[in-house]
């Protein structure tokens, strides 16, 4: 499904003298009214430049920023994005202080040829997400008639639609699934995400290894279930490993994370792994702390000793690291979602950093490596390893839902190649 959707290269001949409406993900962090990290803006620059090369009548960009919950909140305005976007494109960008309505429609219609317009935050309107939070703090559903009008107004701002916002592809929001044009194409950033994930999930080079981390088993049940249908080996680390270890080996886990709900389903997951012939790797030794803080005292324990009361499992030990490295060395496709320990604290980051080093080495030897999920992406950026892996996903929630086997509304809505 993922590879059947049209991209910018399929629609180049349709762009000249047409106005392109493009959904981007410019949800960037701001500091004192300036863009703090432009990575997401940079991500869509190739798509924007390619569209501009085709001499469109104009290009209208729309995005959300932050969580204004359907209200106009000035600190979430898109306006600070303009100078950074102008700098990256080397050309002027016009900012409109709304995203729908008569004034916006008029301004777009009367804009000069080839003009780039950035609309105000889509989420200032309840109709974008289909809900808002009122003055009393209650969640309220948006009026369905108003949602239709909102979508109609957005649609009128272009002749064809390009979506480059992978980060919100798992949301059935108006700007993702409500723009009613025959041509609905993926931008380069979105297409790159889909190409990497479709290859890994539909036709991976084997052995296929998935590395999972995170705190709670119950949050990852669907992910584990889905990946057991696809992979050859699975590393389970991070906080959720202790729930597995307690169930399998009945060891003491001290004050380590324990997920009671997830505990009940461990047997079921292990049975499926056995039936599917998937080799599961769990920690065999651990670095523990007497607190979560940077100044925590540390001690090492293993499966034989268990973890005494007062100690928390916070990272993989050397034997576990060696076993994980061997699994990585065998793999030709690696998908990694979730760090192996409390990587925010340097002394508990070693297991994750070591694993990343081996993933980078294996990538340099020809394996495909995909990094997804906010924490793992942060780790890769901290270690300056972005260029050492095949692909760092820009969408935490979207990549997780893809791996869980879910259909992403924003992707499903794109035009199929055979419909063009």
Swiss-Prot record:
Entry keyword Kinase: yes
Ligand binding (AMP): 215-216, 220, 239, 313, 344
Binding site for CDP: 214, 219, 238, 338, 343
Gene Ontology biological process: gluconeogenesis; glycolytic process
Catalyzed reaction equations: (2R)-3-phosphoglycerate + ATP = (2R)-3-phospho-glyceroyl phosphate + ADP
Molecular function terms from GO: ADP binding; ATP binding; metal ion binding; phosphoglycerate kinase activity
Domain of life: Eukaryota
Biological or metabolic pathway of the protein: Carbohydrate degradation; glycolysis; pyruvate from D-glyceraldehyde 3-phosphate: step 2/5
EC number per UniProt: 2.7.2.3
CDD domains reported in the protein's UniProt record: Phosphoglycerate_kinase (cd00318)
Subunit-structure text: Monomer.
Family according to the record: Belongs to the phosphoglycerate kinase family.
Protein name in UniProt: Phosphoglycerate kinase
Organism of provenance: Tetrahymena thermophila
Lineage per the UniProt record: Eukaryota, Sar, Alveolata, Ciliophora, Intramacronucleata
